[in-house]
Amino acid sequence: MLFGREQFTVPAEMGGEVIDKVYAKELIPTPIEEYEKLPEDEKKLHKPYPFDQRTYEVMPGVICEQDVAVPMRDGVVLYADIFRPADDTVKVPAILAWSNYGKRPNEYRPDELKAYTPGVPAGSISNSAKFEAADPEFWCPNGYAVINVDIRGIGYSGGYHEQFGKQDAEDGYDFIEWTAAQPWCNGRVTMAGSSALAISQWHIAAEQPPHLACIAPWEGMSDMYRESLSEGGIPCIKFTNFATAGACGLEGIDDMGAMAEKYPLMNAYWEDKIPDFSKITVPAYVTAGWNHFHLRGSVIGWRKIASKQKWLRAHREFEWPDFYERHNMEELKAFFDRYCKDIRNGWESTPRVRISVQDRFDDDFRVDRPEDEFPLARTRYEKLYLDASDMRMKRENPEQAVEAGYDPATGEIDFDYTFTEDTELTGYMKLHAWAEARGHDDMDLFVTVKKLSRTGVEQPVTLFHGTAPHPGAWGKLRVSHRELDPELSTDFEPVQAHRRELKLAPGEIVPIDVEINPTSRIWHAGETIRVQIAGRYIRDPHWIEPLMWETDNAGKHVFHTGADHASFLQIPVILPKYDDDYVFEVDEEKHPTHPIF
């Protein structure tokens, strides 16, 4: 339940199923002067939210048309603030900011939003910006309009708020087509922003609005069930409640947390929140942070979209400092200039894939290394076999069968392997193991792949300009959800089906495959790779997000290794682009002989 708010249910037909959709009452949008008069105990049910249809000057040469009404195909009206150059003689493209976070978050408490964007230097974002969105005071002087939208069910916009999915995507389609027809617009619309504003781009682009010129999803999930509400099958409802707690509207919000409790397995409701990537054909500039929960979706989205013109940049930093970093804003401008203004600025020479290879702390081994694809074609998958006799990993499966276990409430087990030569791991890892739950019928597993120095000291990577430690690549699994989806799984990326629960019988030992999110990191000779298995999430307590899982653990977790229970960590070893025997030859298809010769 969303912070104890009143709920109601609306039946809906989805994918041939009748789904009882749970909605929660939102905070009530209230004009500031009325909000201030409310008794303190009533204020918690309201949110100061002005409605004021006017046009005003934001800065020299830039105006804002505030609370503009935009009709959707079903008659529901959405409201938006349109920031644009004041000169109507020059038509400009528009950047759409689409999320439920409110179109004017800085109006009542101007410093509140800035507190939610750590890592971004003070003064970097203007008060015109919507949370996680393009800043109008940067983009409008550069010849763009920025539209901050209160999407369906948010603020004074009509209807129930649907979090992602078909309804939200259709609204995005309608809004883009309305925008393109405005007299100040050049007929091209794009989208920008991180997190929720990136997720919405996948869904809206899949609807193929004719005037959507390109997209720039800056870290966005591809599957709300597998990547947010039930990663690995382990419920994580508190974060969703945290992220939507401030939503305000007149009707109600799609309560994903309540739906995860009501429908804990994959069904049509959750499938509606997975975009059809095969229908995304517009140019796309996608970013992925190696250490953030949007990672899986960002990479999968880039891999699966049908766009012939698509770029991926994978980096170490968190989404907010990366999005507002000046160089990255200028690079995004070059991308938008190319596809929204037809400026031939050489964008096509940008490498299709750029990868930052992490080392330790804030030190990257390589930054923006150009590649042609992801996963890399020169990947060699190797297996490091777990051996519980000495808690090491070996190149061969141990002949002796041994077990190791821990109390899931307090303990964990570590398996180590020390590299004898510099080794880069870039791509997908997976853990294949044999698990037993003693004294219970299920196990929630939290797997982390760490790096240790030559002296055995753990070496995390750091985010937010070196202030927040992150241990490394991770994966999760509720063992009763171990069954794989054969259509989605590959040899390097096991994906659970989540269609049924397979509880464990007493004494039953089962094989499991844990999907580990992609990464890129270097281990120097003498450094150790550690795979840690635990029954709880182990991370620095000062981490920014309240990532809390509803675990189902009891008794003892036992893992069997060796002999008939071969268990291993599969790693993506990256071979050098050129070995010692490489002889350079010109690729005539890529570089044909010039006619002058």
PLM features: residue spans?
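Active-site-proximal cap/loop segments of hydrolase catalytic domains
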Residues: Y49-E348, R352-I355
